[in-house]
Regions:
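Short acidic-glycine-tyrosine-enriched beta hairpin
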Residues: 64-78
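Short, conserved beta-strand element in jelly-roll/cupin
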Residues: 44-61, 76
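Tight coil/turn sites that cap or link beta-strands
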Residues: 36-37, 71-72, 80, 100-102
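Short, Lys/Arg-enriched, Trp-marked, Pro/Gly-tolerant hinge/linker segments that flank
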Residues: 125-135, 150-164, 169-207
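A hydrophobic/aromatic-rich effector-binding and dimerization subdomain
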Residues: 2-31, 82-150, 170-171
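Conserved short histidine dyad/triad with adjacent acidic residue
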Residues: 29-45
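Short beta-strand His + acidic residue motifs that chelate non-heme Fe in jelly-roll/DSBH
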Residues: 59-61, 77, 83-89
């Protein structure tokens, strides 16, 4: 990396951290445990909320559906979504990260074919009130690094956190492109979406 590139990178990171309206990189970053069947909510907030189920299981109740999360799974609750949290029969421990959407708004990506990828505004919209992520250690580790940096606040931590947020957004984009199915109770719809994604390059005949 030459000097001009290095200065550009540092300048970009500095610009992002200085231009956050809230001046906060996160509002909640912690491990929290809940007793069996303990509930929290219902409530909603502007913040994007990411919970990694470190132990046990839990249920997230939305206005018109409920979604179960087990150990090792991740829930992403989008801004403005009304939700109620309920711990499972053995309780649960979560790694929580909550931050304002404006952080993601500083990152814009292009897809590999050169077109503009989905923006954070469309990705974290009402259509995706809750995103369920399974079997993705990479996303969990990035969330863990963000929480650790915010907790210990070592030198230059703000720059690292901004870069980790960018990595987190890329990994979420990748997950949504490769394996995500919208959370819904209609099994036929899930199968149809899965079929289309597997055969999108082929001609599909609708009957």
């Amino acid at each position: 990396m030459n000097k001009s590139t290095e200065q550009t990178l540092w300048g970009l990171l500095e610009n992002i951290t200085e231009n956050l309206k809230s001046k906060r990189l996160a509002d909640v970053f912690r491990l929290v445990s809940f007793c069996p069947f303990e509930t929290y909510g219902p409530h909603k907030h502007v913040r994007i909320e990411i919970n990694y189920v470190k132990k046990g299981n839990c249920i997230l109740h939305l206005d018109d559906e409920s979604v179960t999360f087990r150990e090792g799974e991740i829930m992403i609750i989008t801004s403005g979504s009304n939700h109620l949290f309920e711990a499972g029969s053995e309780g649960t421990t979560l790694m929580q990260l909550e931050f304002l959407p404006e952080i993601f708004s500083h990152f814009h990506f292009k897809s590999e074919d050169g077109t503009v990828a989905s923006t954070p505004v469309t990705l974290f919209s009402e259509e995706n009130r809750v995103i369920k992520i399974v079997n993705n250690v990479c996303i969990m580790r990035v969330v863990q690094r963000i929480v650790n940096e915010l907790e210990f606040k070592s030198r230059y931590y703000r720059y690292l956190v901004v870069m980790y947020y960018a990595e987190l957004l890329v990994l979420i984009y990748r997950y949504m492109d490769e394996s995500y199915l919208p959370i819904c109770t209609n099994d036929s719809l899930k199968k149809a979406i899965a079929y289309i994604r597997l055969n999108y390059q082929s001609e599909i005949t609708m009957q």
